[in-house]
Amino acid sequence: MAISAKLVKELREKTGAGMMDCKKALTETDGDIDKAVDFLREKGIAKAAKKSDRIAAEGLVHVEERGNEAAIVEINSETDFVARNEGFQQLVKEIAIQVLDTKAETVEALLETNLPDGKSVDQRVKEAISTIGEKLSIRRFAVRTKTDNDSFGAYLHMGGRIGVLTVVEGSTDAEAAKDVAMHIAAINPKYVSSEQVSEDEIAHERDVLKQQALNEGKPENIVEKMVEGRLRKYLQEICAVDQNFVKNPDQTVEAFLKSKGGKLVDFVRYEVGEGMEKREENFADEVKGQMK
């Protein structure tokens, strides 16, 4: 099958591999992007696909805490200029409060709820669109709860480009919970702990690592031991509690919180626009440059 430039671009963004390597991988896998990622990894050309592989939209993430409840919200705009607008920032905060007030479970349900002034959230967003002059949309939100013996950690990076909400059980040290939220913003783990990783994901990773070791020419009798070591490293990379704490790399996140009497039980990390299609700018010029 013909491999499109768009597909090559997507694989490059996922893996960081070179254009020709990506094209070959897609050709070998009949254009299946997930199989192409594995192909590149097995050849030692690429690391695991990034979690936030395609980021394009602008906007803000906001975290609103109230007692034993907290909400994290992402609202998108078209430009970064609008994301810095005070009116837009106020809208995002207002929507986060509305999430806590209404207990809405979906964006659609939230849009139909009424604000204290009697207007629906949908009306409020449309008014903001008219005033600001850009398309705005509520993309997603999440609510977390805790007890009086626990703590929330809220951290916003780059003024709300990345937002994290953590739930730490057994400790009321909100500063420690915030430090862990900062760690999660920086390192971007997928899970709290290895207990959350599915058996299917572990089996898939084990297969990829085994093929990778065999392709490196390692003797069959030591491959299994190598695979288990690399699998432990992989799990450390994707599980928050096993990672070296950014503020003190000599201890893990789990050890840091344990010293405060707490345990990380949940987190939500939003990065503005993650997973959304990028605008296709300058890729044709890049292709032309490669062909010279």
From Swiss-Prot:
Coiled coil: none annotated. InterPro entries: EF-Ts_dimer_sf, Transl_elong_EFTs/EF1B, Transl_elong_EFTs/EF1B_dimer, Transl_elong_Ts_CS, UBA-like_sf. Its main location: cytoplasm. One of its GO terms (molecular function) is translation elongation factor activity. Residues 79-82 are annotated as: Involved in Mg(2+) ion dislocation from EF-Tu. Keywords: Cytoplasm, Elongation factor, Protein biosynthesis. GO terms for cellular component: cytoplasm. It is found in: Cytoplasm. Associates with the EF-Tu.GDP complex and induces the exchange of GDP to GTP. It remains bound to the aminoacyl-tRNA.EF-Tu.GTP complex up to the GTP hydrolysis stage on the ribosome. Belongs to the EF-Ts family. PANTHER family: ELONGATION FACTOR TS, ELONGATION FACTOR TS, MITOCHONDRIAL. NCBIfam families: tsf. This is Elongation factor Ts. It comes from Staphylococcus saprophyticus subsp. saprophyticus (strain ATCC 15305 / DSM 20229 / NCIMB 8711 / NCTC 7292 / S-41).
